[in-house]
């Protein structure tokens, strides 16, 4: 499914940071879908065991390869969305307030300063998503 990112999402990330921003985007997209339509489910939120629907087939996401790929994709979409903001604020390089906002935005869409920080942030996102797409909770609700 194509993930959409709005300027409001980018603003949310700027105010709340990378992890909360990515969580917000995923959760908004998933909440729009019925549990049976979601492309991802978590069968064990403690061990973070995810199943991903790929080419109409459910597959165990062994090393979180697909989920990590999706997190990076959302981050990249946010970076691209910054260009929309830049076009709407062409004076951002000259206006100190806008320049500051731009740098805060950039900080909020980058996963981390090093691979250790990136992995730590990805794990936080996966834990939250595990709770959101927990198939056991969904089955209890029906």
Which residues fall in each region the model found?
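Extended amphipathic coiled-coil helices
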Residues: 1-142
